[in-house]
Amino acid sequence: MPHASATNLGSGSITIAPYTWAKRKKREFDRIIGCYDPDTQRRKIIQFHLPDPPALLVLKFVDLDEPAPPPHDARKELRLASGDDLVSALEFDRPEERLLVHCHAGISRSSAIALAILAGRMGAGNERIAVGELFRIKPEAVPNLHVVTLADRLLARDGQLLEAVLACETPRSRERRRLNREAYLAYYGCN
């Protein structure tokens, strides 16, 4: 299974990858969006030590499809993505340039941000095509549903983007979502 995959839309491309791959290949891109946990230390964020680095957008939000249970939902380290995060990602995109979107595993947060960008590029009415393109780029993608919901609202897609993602759900993706939530909540002591 490849660690990263790309698609061309216009003269640029979108690649979705895990952090370790992104760290090695970062100079091959014009723009990078990194999705990190809110408590990620600066030294763990991709760094550039040579001149002329790619443009970098750092987004910090937890990989949960819905908020942690109260009272944990107010904790800074369990911050969900916001509309501002999505606006930043969409404004950061340049379709003519090579874009890398990464998160820790390259499966959920990065695929949801990439889907928002694909849907934005393709325009209203093409939500199923955008989701199809996402799964062509990254067959193992399990896009973060909270991020997809935000993108759907921000792009005024009337639920069509979220519906297109949910139509592709499998028992495996549902199980991955469940295990991911359990792991996050256990890690942050929310049991």
Question: Which sequence ranges carry the predicted segments?
Answer:
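Glycine-rich, flexible N-terminal cofactor/catalytic loop recognition
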Residues: 2-54, 59
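Anionic group-transfer/hydrolysis microenvironments
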Residues: 36, 62, 104
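A structural signal for well-ordered alpha-helical segments within the folded catalytic domains
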Residues: 84-87, 111-112, 145, 149
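PTP/DSP superfamily signal
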Residues: 94-98, 119-191
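Catalytic cysteine-centered active loop of the rhodanese-like fold, especially the PTP/DSP P-loop
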Residues: 92-121
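Short catalytic/ligand-binding loop motif for oxyanion handling, primarily in non-cytosolic enzymes
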Residues: 41-42, 67, 108-112
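Intrinsically disordered, low-complexity regulatory segments
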Residues: 6, 55-65, 177, 183-191
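Helix-loop module immediately N-terminal to the HCX5R catalytic loop
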Residues: 53, 57-100
